Amino acid sequence: MNDNISPIHSPYKAPNTISLVAGKGDTNNPLNAFDMALLDAGICNVNLIKISSIMPPKAEVVPLPDIPMGSLVPTAYGYKTSDIKGETVSAAVSVAIPKDKELCGLIMEYSAIGGKKETEDTVREMAKTGFEMRGWEIDKIISLASECTVENIGCAFAAVALWYK
């Protein structure tokens, strides 16, 4: 560790925006179905870095910004793939935003076999439970979900991308 940098003064700046995105894809293999879902969600051509589920304090919810190709993008995401024709898969994310703006928010992600309504209901309940466990008050919960009814190999994807304003 560099002795000149205190852990309190980390060289890494926390992102100050979050964006919810969701998409679906169906093609001839799981990886391309996932990639197609990223294309549909508008978050392709970047490197998603999977993170645990914390929204930095005071982060602003914004539409997905124009992120340079190849960027490393901190992202909490869920996805579900299937090769069973006619099966519906879904993925959802939610963000619980605290009343106390000095606190962090909670991002939850979930995926399942079934429709997006049930998956979105589940992920919203997960965010609520996370706040209850911490004893925090919720200002609001936002969420987004996708579903894909499989024809070949299908993928449903939902994410919260963290970025900088």
UniProtKB/Swiss-Prot annotation:
Residues recorded as bearing Pyruvic acid (Ser) in the entry: 53
Keywords carried by this UniProt record: Decarboxylase, Lyase, Pyruvate
A Pfam family: PvlArgDC
Name of the gene encoding the protein in the UniProt record: pdaD
Lineage start: Archaea, Methanobacteriati, Methanobacteriota, Methanomada group, Methanococci
Keyword Hydrolase: no
Cofactor detail note: Binds 1 pyruvoyl group covalently per subunit.
Protein name (database record): Pyruvoyl-dependent arginine decarboxylase
Record field: catalytic activity: L-arginine + H(+) = agmatine + CO2
UniProt similarity note: Belongs to the PdaD family.
Entries under Gene3D superfamilies matching the protein: 3.30.60.30, Pyruvoyl-Dependent Histidine Decarboxylase, subunit B (3.50.20.10)
Annotated GO biological process: arginine catabolic process
HAMAP family reported for this sequence: PvlArgDC
InterPro entries: Pyr-dep_his/arg-deCO2ase, Pyr-dep_his/arg-deCO2ase_sand, Pyruvoyl-dep_arg_deCO2ase
Required co-factors: pyruvate
Top EC group: lyase
Residues at the site labelled Cleavage (non-hydrolytic): 52-53
EC number: 4.1.1.19
GO molecular function term, any single one: arginine decarboxylase activity
Domain of life: Archaea
